[in-house]
């Protein structure tokens, strides 16, 4: 995803980006079948040593210590193009947190959302504790994160997580129409 956003930002012909899932899910989250090793940096094949500051402290802001979901989320946030999330199905864990920095989110009536971290004994990832309250308010963000429950598109719409809900077959046409409206009616330097 990072490479795709880099390419889109570098292409002046790209005026908007639509992110959706393949198949029935938007993104069902991390594969937790490895148990604790799922989040063990030392077990990752792409592991890098954490860089140090001159005073010997770890440079925590560097990509070497940021989790993969955090890097993707930050890249989406930094995108130079408007980003539309077309949430077509299950969006749990990183699947729900990666959509938070998207400029506009629309959902299929079949979409399901879940900030399930508390139920898994892990902390919310990818700056979701920063993005989520800004989108839905502190009370809703706390409820969703503390209960870890799965909720549907109607609740996501009512609480402001998504802009609109569409029948599954109408989701991508709606996302494309929105992208086209942005591209046709906004100067490239204004959005």
Protein language model features and the residues they cover:
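Conserved CoA-thioester-binding segment of acyl-CoA-metabolizing enzymes
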Residues: 1-24, 37-38
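Short, contiguous strand/loop micro-motifs
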Residues: 9, 59-60, 139-141
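C-terminal capping/lid region of NAD(P)-dependent oxidoreductase domains
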Residues: 15, 190-191
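Glycine- (often His-adjacent) and acidic-residue-rich active-site loop
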Residues: 21-75, 91, 121
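Crotonase-fold acyl-CoA enzyme core
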Residues: 74-188
């Amino acid at each position: 995803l990072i490479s795709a956003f880099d390419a889109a930002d570098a292409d002046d012909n790209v005026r908007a980006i639509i992110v959706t899932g393949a198949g029935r899910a938007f993104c069902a989250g991390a594969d937790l079948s490895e148990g604790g090793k799922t989040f063990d940096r030392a077990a990752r094949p792409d592991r890098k040593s954490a860089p140090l500051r001159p005073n010997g402290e770890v440079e925590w802001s560097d990509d070497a210590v940021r989790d993969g979901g955090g890097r993707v989320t930050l890249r989406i946030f930094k995108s130079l193009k408007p980003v539309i999330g077309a949430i077509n199905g299950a969006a749990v864990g990183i699947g729900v947190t990666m959509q938070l920095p998207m400029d506009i989110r629309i959902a299929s009536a079949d979409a399901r959302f879940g900030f399930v971290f508390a139920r898994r004994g892990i902390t919310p990832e990818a700056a979701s504790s920063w993005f989520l309250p800004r989108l839905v308010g502190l009370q809703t963000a706390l409820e969703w994160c503390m209960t870890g429950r799965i909720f549907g598109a109607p609740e996501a719409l009512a609480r402001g997580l998504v802009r609109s809900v569409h029948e599954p077959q109408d989701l991508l046409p709606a996302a494309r129409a929105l992208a086209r409206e942005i591209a046709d009616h906004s100067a490239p330097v204004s959005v």
